[in-house]
Amino acid sequence: MPPLADHDERRATVAEVAADLIEQRGLDAVTFREIADAAGTSTAIVSHYFIDKKDLLRFTYGAAASRARRRLDAQVEAESEVDEKTLVGAVEALLPLDKGSRRDWRVWFAFWGLAVADPDLAAEQRAHVRGARDELAGLIGRLVTLGHLPEDLEVEDSARDLLVVVMGLAAQAVFDPKDWPPPRQRAFIARHIARLSRG
């Protein structure tokens, strides 16, 4: 691992290595020894930046969630006009459509398994899900205000439903990618959002 002056940058680098290990070999591969070996550094360096495995996993999960949020934000900001296509693009930004987003979903699924029995990790998971849901609700609300979606649409319920659809679709796509290639994922989401438009 090259020398890095910035503490946060070093933590992010270690978390990237951890995410790669989770994707390739699962959570059991995430030990300070395995991470140090993969990063070409020592366990002392890894333990300098993370108190324990839980701290490392929480940070790795948070980094994956932040990447998804940045993809969503970038998609919305790239649209010159806010319309139904904006919502489709925002949802697609959350799906496992490429190598990076598939890795992020694998990290999330691994983390969720731990969060079932750990209240701190469960709270972290809830916070990230609520953040994504709130962002989708904000976008859906704008589309209702602009007349692109029915005025009687339940915004909060629609955002909640849409996020559940994303999570279910992502699970199918990550664990059965041949059956759920990116074009099929996109078509599925487009159909779901078209149903929102019809009310």
Predicted regions and their residues:
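Solvent-exposed, amphipathic alpha-helical segments
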Residues: 13, 17-25, 71-75, 107, ...
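Short secondary-structure transition hinges
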Residues: 89-138
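Hydrophobic/aromatic-rich alpha-helical bundle segments in the mid-to-C-terminal region
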Residues: 2-3, 102, 120-126, 130, ...
